[in-house]
Regions:
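N-terminal localization/anchoring segments of enzymes in phospholipid and broader phosphate metabolism
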Residues: 1-355, 359, 363, 403, ...
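Helical hairpin unit composed of two closely spaced alpha helices linked by a short loop
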Residues: 374-396, 400, 405-407
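Short, glycine-rich nucleotide/cofactor-binding loops
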Residues: 185-190, 371-378
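Catalytic-core elements of nucleic-acid end-processing and repair enzymes
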Residues: 437
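Histidine/acidic-residue-rich catalytic or RNA/ligand-binding cores of hydrolases
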Residues: 380-382, 409-411, 441-444
């Protein structure tokens, strides 16, 4: 597929550092050329520049009328106002319509759900409506977007990256039919060395092994030599949205941020955990790395397996077996319901992830606990949290104490005053970096997945997650959240008011560009 070419084995590769340098230099030359032409037009071609200004005005009107967040459009308005030629050229290169031409469109809807699966989902929704009527709306909302509701699924909450990754590697070692991995980051190191040996051994045994990873997330961390080794033994590797040196083919946005692992159809994992040493605290980055995820065993695993297959097929992959081969084969009996779902920019402006979050916030009556590494809310999300706080809901927002990006943290902190004013408790996880993405409501519903509470996750990146209703794992999640609070510092209004003058000056400026963080 154009814009998403799969690099073939034997293709000449260069080191990550040289590759980055080449891309940066070529981009600088191209952007410099654009700026030079713009100023030439401005100084010497008044008539042409007037035409450009009129064109910029029409483009601004077009952008305003497109669906989407006004905060995103505001950046383009400012750019078109300050430098019309540059703004127009950048929009046509990197604006919404230009970049979306290169997105996988899910035009190949393999695998199609048989009527029996849809019927079981409808039966599950009816049962959920009787048991937990407050959550039937969310379940129906996702079902209408083709994300089925499952029973007969054991959902295990995994409160640490090290626990999840050890569990995953042990399961991969037992695989008999297939192993599917889709990750934003696959980083070479101790964890990868162990996993690679198992993957190669399984491929030699005839197990179907497929890997999807995002090129931008791995440009310095996953070498061409590693890809060659995998392909030599039969592992199929697909590179999502390769970083390109030409500006019209370079996509800063629309990355594959999902974390999905599927083994033999019966087991699937998702959450915030990538495959890299820092996620298991083998190496230290930003203090203690606190992450989490879930393991699905049973019917619900199919929701994540099907999502992987759709992405793989849209990247040019071929599924070597019939549909039923990839479905769960081992029956499981368990309490509660689960509903895996995915999100991506092709859905805009209908974004399941943000819509689900808003429904969870508005549905809270007693407790609303949230963990997220990045908090850059839009107006609707911010308003919903404030309404929940004003309504007497115990709202707790848990964020990193040692953030990885100071500018994103600065933007998040700018919202604290308003949240605290409306009764929301904001906590900073003091041991280090809190990377888990989870929501718990009233001890009856929960979300765990890859979705951050920011514009990038809601609008620009491919994401995934699982809604869980009435399952025992919710208590495990609550226990972990209580532990996080015990190891966190409550942010007070007085402390927030004492932040530095420099930080206060930068906050409104950074908010303008928050959508690209």
């Amino acid at each position: 597929m154009k814009g998403f070419q799969i690099q073939q084995k034997g293709e000449r590769r260069i080191s990550a550092a040289l590759r980055i340098m080449l891309v940066v230099v070529l981009l600088a030359v191209q952007i410099g050329f654009v700026v030079a032409i713009s100023y030439f037009m401005q100084e010497y071609l008044a008539l042409a520049y007037g035409v450009v200004q009129v064109g910029a005005l029409f483009l601004a009107v077009h952008i305003y009328n497109e669906p989407g967040e006004l905060s995103y459009k505001l950046i383009w308005f400012i750019l078109l106002l300050l430098a019309p030629p540059v703004g127009m050229i950048l929009w046509f290169l990197w604006g919404g319509a230009a970049q979306k031409r290169h997105l996988p469109r899910n035009t190949k809807r393999f695998p199609d759900e048989p009527e029996s699966v849809r019927m079981r989902s409808e039966i599950a929704v009816d049962k959920l409506t009787r048991q937990l009527p407050a959550w039937s709306r969310t379940a129906n909302y996702l079902c209408r977007r083709d994300f089925q509701l499952y029973q007969n699924t054991s959902v295990t909450y995994l409160p640490e990256g090290a626990i999840l990754l050890r569990n995953l590697i042990d399961r991969v070692a037992k695989a008999e039919r297939f192993i599917f991995l889709e990750y934003f980051i696959l980083a070479e190191g101790k964890l990868w060395d162990e996993l690679e040996k198992i993957l190669c051994a399984k491929a030699r045994e005839g197990v179907e092994v497929k890997i999807i990873f995002d090129d931008f997330g791995n440009i310095k961390r996953f070498s061409g030599e590693t890809i060659d080794r995998l392909r030599e033994v039969g592992v199929e590797v697909f590179i999502f949205n390769p970083v390109h040196e030409y500006v019209n083919r370079l996509h800063f946005n629309y990355r594959d941020h999902r974390k999905i692992a599927c083994i033999d159809g019966d087991v699937a994992y998702t959450g915030g955990v990538n495959i890299a040493d820092e996620y298991a605290n083998i190496i230290e980055r930003f203090g203690y790395w606190k992450d989490s995820g879930v393991c699905l065993e049973g019917d619900g695993a199919w929701g994540l397996t099907a999502s992987f297959i759709r992405m793989c097929v849209n990247l040019g992959g071929v599924m070597h077996n019939e549909h039923d081969y990839y479905r769960p084969h081992t029956p499981v009996k368990s309490e509660g319901f689960c509903q895996p779902f995915t999100d991506g920019p092709q859905n805009n402006p209908d974004n399941p992830a943000e819509d689900v979050f808003l429904q969870m916030i508005s549905g809270a009556r007693r407790f609303l606990y949230i963990t997220t590494p990045y908090f850059i809310p839009d107006e609707s999300l911010m308003r919903a949290l404030c309404i929940a706080g004003d309504g007497g809901v115990d709202v707790r927002l848990m964020l990193p104490g040692k953030p990885d990006h100071w500018y994103a943290d600065c933007v998040a902190e700018s919202y604290f005053g308003e949240l605290i004013k409306h009764g929301v408790k904001v906590y900073r996880y003091t041991p280090g970096f809190l990377h888990g993405k989870s929501i718990m409501v009233d001890r009856v519903a929960a979300f765990v997945g890859s979705v951050n509470m920011d514009y990038r996750s809601f609008e620009l990146d491919y994401e995934c997650g699982v809604m869980v209703y009435g399952a025992p794992m919710i208590e495990s999640l609550l226990e972990d959240m209580d532990m996080i609070v015990d190891h966190s510092r409550l942010v007070t209004k007085e402390e927030w008011a004492k932040r530095s003058v420099l930080r206060r000056v930068f906050e409104p400026l950074l908010r303008l560009f928050a959508i690209w963080m």
